[in-house]
């Protein structure tokens, strides 16, 4: 199957993420929280490198995964409630809490939705754009819900030690707003990125028609 990115670009991106991973790990506020936050990056990056020839993804998806990985690693470094740029946005918008975690949950909907869309469209598993859009949003929300369950299990297992990982900042509706942000990310995929995504799929011969 034709590669969608030159090996140099893909390997450079992977190297950059590896260096950021090492740096954020060394300077992490809490090593256990950092490890819990960056585990998806540790799993996904080697997987993408291993499947580059057999199942290359669109450049759009590679780019968004790259950005999401950085968001996760920065969140793990400082903990989401203490990311400096989040405090700047909080002050600028007059918010009551650091909103950086909401950016993370937005990408938690955006990226899985695009992954699901790419798999469904390329495999021709579903007919009809509306059904694809519906299933893509369902997948993103399911992943978001699973993450909230993981946070709950962490809270049960670690008690107050899980506070940095949970990052609720005293918000009683944190779980619901997290999932809403993930839904907004998924809707961004199906409303604003779908057409461009299809153009890339056709351009690289990943779909026909």
Label the predicted regions.
Residues 52-55, 83, 119-128, 154, ...:
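Membrane-interfacial segments
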Residues 1-15:
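N-terminal membrane topogenic signal
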